[in-house]
């Protein structure tokens, strides 16, 4: 009986020594509890919107657009609006989006300077004559505006691409963002 116990003990120790014991959380748990709104998350959302709008840009043969900073429900530019518009600019300037031709996006500094000269503010909707003046001053064929709306359960980012000469909406797209404390904080700071 003692021999049998000793044999089981040795077998148990042998099996236990061959097992790996890990104190760190597995990748499954880190993915499950990972923050959903890191920069890669926003980059993916911006690329999705950009790809949708790029299809219509190809159809209209537009070579240059202006991306305005995105506004909230009361037409103010929040930190989140600035950040997301920068991500959209980044996605549009990716050379893989328009491989067969040159495509340009107006620089933000130039946009802000022209808005100041024309006595305009970042807005979601512009009057037709304001669109024409912006297009002429920025040498742009279309203006991309965006609105960020807090719906309580999530945040909607809606983009509209408008032709500066006709005032016609060329394309529009919406993306739902995860509503986190961080996103709400960025949406409420100007």
Describe the residue ranges of each PLM region:
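Short, solvent-exposed, polar/charged sequence segments at loop or secondary-structure edges
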Residues: 83-89, 101-143, 151-152
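Short beta-strand segments enriched in small/hydrophobic residues
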Residues: 63-74
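Sec-exported extracytoplasmic/periplasmic mature domains
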Residues: 54-58, 89-98
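Bacterial N-terminal signal peptides that target proteins for export
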Residues: 1-8
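Bacterial N-terminal signal peptides
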Residues: 8-17
